[in-house]
């Protein structure tokens, strides 16, 4: 479970988040809807530790959360396969080419091509594949 209590975030004098309270429970799907600039991405960046904030965000100790941000960055000299292998190693997981190939039967990505050359949609798929391979319990997906 993830619990957000009295969350506040300011950029300079501009209040972006003001007293947010939320609970996310395992096994459920949640959607966060709001106008552009409403603070959705800021909330996700607070929840994942990218931004400092005031208030509290409590996560179960064993909870593994993965975050797919709105913008993706891929090194120009790394293939889709190399990116997925890197993401698995970063989480301390053994790299299984067979598991990657099996998952790619669903996503149908050209994993031998440089990820930086992928279309925007292909980059999103690659990022989501990485989250699935990392065995996360919760997926925070921004746009």
Model regions and ranges:
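Q-loop/switch helix immediately C-terminal to the Walker
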Residues: 71, 76-91
């Amino acid at each position: 479970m993830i619990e957000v209590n009295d969350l506040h975030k300011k950029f300079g004098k501009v209040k972006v988040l003001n007293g947010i309270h939320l609970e996310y429970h395992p096994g459920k799907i949640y959607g966060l809807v709001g106008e552009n600039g409403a603070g959705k991405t800021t909330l996700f960046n607070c929840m994942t530790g990218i931004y400092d904030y005031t208030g509290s965000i409590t996560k179960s100790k064993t909870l593994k959360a993965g975050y797919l941000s709105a913008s993706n960055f891929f090194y120009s000299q790394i293939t889709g396969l190399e990116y997925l292998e890197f993401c698995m190693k970063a989480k301390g997981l053994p790299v299984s080419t067979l598991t990657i190939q099996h998952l790619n039967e669903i996503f149908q990505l050209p994993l031998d091509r440089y990820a930086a050359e992928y279309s925007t949609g292909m980059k999103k798929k690659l990022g989501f594949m990485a989250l699935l391979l990392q065995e996360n319990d919760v997926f925070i997906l921004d746009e």
